[in-house]
């Protein structure tokens, strides 16, 4: 019998704390699969803010940094400038990114910062 699906290496074995039916677990798996497929686990840094994404450091095997509410793009900018060889991504919910964090997101885009922003609604 062949294995059809296995857990991505970029995900830990920690049980998810999200509510039943929430898509965060699926999105975590997709992010981890991308990290595995690109072979960037050892040089990836995730930035998570408050809200549901706050525990991302428990679920990804890459380095993770906590950011204040809405400030993940600003923190990601600082991390990327300090470590330009690393892949830096933010993992943010709608209240964090599209409400209090709108300015940081827009300005990071306007400056063409080399970060990836994952917007979870």
Which stretches of residues belong to each language-model region?
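Thiamine diphosphate
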Residues: 52-121
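Active-site diphosphate/adenylate-binding microenvironment
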Residues: 3, 8-68
């Amino acid at each position: 019998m062949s294995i059809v699906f296995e857990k991505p290496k970029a995900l830990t074995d920690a049980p998810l704390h999200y509510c039943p039916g929430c898509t965060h677990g699926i999105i975590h798996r997709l992010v981890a699969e991308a990290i595995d497929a690109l072979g960037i686990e050892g040089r990836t840094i995730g930035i998570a803010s408050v809200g549901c994404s706050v525990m991302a450091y428990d679920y990804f095997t890459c380095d993770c940094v906590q950011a204040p509410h809405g400030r993940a793009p600003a923190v990601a900018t600082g991390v990327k400038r300090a470590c330009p060889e690393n892949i830096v991504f933010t993992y943010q919910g709608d209240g964090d990114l599209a409400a209090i964090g709108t300015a940081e997101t827009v300005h990071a885009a306007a400056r063409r910062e080399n970060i990836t922003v994952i917007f979870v609604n």
